[in-house]
Amino acid sequence: MILPPRGTKDFTPELAILWKEIVSKIESVYQKYGFDPIITPIVEYWDTLKGKYGEEAEKKEIWRFRVPQSKKWYALKYDQTVPLARYFARFRPKLPFKRYTIDRTFRYDEPQKGRYREFWQADADIVGSPYPEADAEILNMMIEAYETLGFNVYLRVSDRRALESLIEKVGEKDKFIEIARIIDKWDKIGEEGVLEKLKQITDKAEKIIELLKENPEEFYPKEFWEIIDLVEKKNKIKIDIKLARGFDYYTGMVYEVWIEGFNRALGGGGRYDNLIGIFSKEKIPAVGGSIGINPLIDVGLEKGIFNLNKKTYTQIAVIYIEVFKEAWRIANKLRDLGLNVYIDLLRRDFKKQMEYVIEKDIRYLVIVGKKDLANNLVTFQDRLTRERKKIPIENLEEIKSLVQ
């Protein structure tokens, strides 16, 4: 088979270059806010992940396997957060611990637009602070990260405690998680679908819907409003009590990142005060967020925010006419100057070399021919402006100033 497994993706040079630029911009924003990177293994022991994500994820979505030469069960990373909890228990970093991880994760989900089985996540988390300013910093940073990438996004924001208060008010506190999971499907199945499913488990379904539609401020704790008060761009915030994502582990503020015209969130996160200490048997407050790079690329290309115009990192192609060895030495001198240089390795004629350069869209040429060499010169050419210039070989550093 020449196709990769369903739900995974090959990245061509154009796509990989775009991916690298996106990651670089995200990292620059994360670092601006004082976050440092860590890297955890792509594979964990199954016992590390077991019991952390809920029954449905464990049975249907986690990639679990055992190799013939081992008796242990392993699993591919389902997210970046449980590995962070394991890392924290092992290394006990000084608090607050502000880390980011940009890595692949795996979920055996049904592939569709914007959804993959192997995908990249850019996570950032603050471990150790229970205060609203930590939550607000995550929201501010995520807004800035998306804007740096060219996206005009808005954040749907809510708080688990608000929905808990609402459900408690109608007398169904014991069914909170079950009710929250149904409410979380509002965007997919609509009000009528949610109402129908709620009626199957409670006789307070219509009252719940009524309260949800009112989106009442009374249910939100004061800590939530302190978070919102610290958000710099409040026009990017849409408070929505129907947002009920991840309440198996989120304990406070939750958010999702949306862009108009795209049918799923581009990222999300929230406060989870009961997870990080799960391995060290203590309560460690934490809040974080994640940028889904795969759907980000999909929607960015679709809306013209990104393009695949850049096909190579190569700045200069050294083109030779029957003088390969001399051209080889010149190419290496240019590399010593810090330039990215291509030289043909198939000993092709001038026409074939140029066909490759055009296909790869390499802008600058250094042409090495017998006549120029006799005068200790090379010809520098800008394919975009069509300008040509003779450069003495002893002054090759001049080329560096001509390359944009």
UniProtKB/Swiss-Prot annotation:
Superkingdom in the source lineage: Archaea
Keywords (A to Z) from UniProt: Aminoacyl-tRNA synthetase, ATP-binding, Cytoplasm, Ligase, Nucleotide-binding, Protein biosynthesis
Reactions this protein catalyses: tRNA(His) + L-histidine + ATP = L-histidyl-tRNA(His) + AMP + diphosphate + H(+)
EC code: 6.1.1.21
GO BP terms in the entry: histidyl-tRNA aminoacylation
Transmembrane segments: none
Class of the enzyme per the UniProt entry, highest EC level: ligase
UniProt-listed SUPFAM superfamilies: Class II aaRS ABD-related (SSF52954), Class II aaRS and biotin synthetases (SSF55681)
Primary localisation category: cytoplasm
GO MF, one annotated term: ATP binding
InterPro entries xref list: aa-tRNA-synth_II (IPR006195), aa-tRNA-synth_II/BPL/LPL (IPR045864), Anticodon-bd (IPR004154), Anticodon-bd_dom_sf (IPR036621), His-tRNA-ligase (IPR015807), HisRS-like_core (IPR041715), HisRS/HisZ (IPR004516)
Short name of one Pfam family: tRNA-synt_His
GO cellular component: cytosol
CDD domains in the cross-refs: HisRS-like_core
Subcellular location: Cytoplasm
Keyword Nucleotide-binding: yes
NCBIfam families in alphabetical order: hisS
Record family assignment: Belongs to the class-II aminoacyl-tRNA synthetase family.
Database matches in HAMAP family: His_tRNA_synth (MF_00127)
Protein name as annotated: Histidine--tRNA ligase
Provenance organism: Nanoarchaeum equitans (strain Kin4-M)
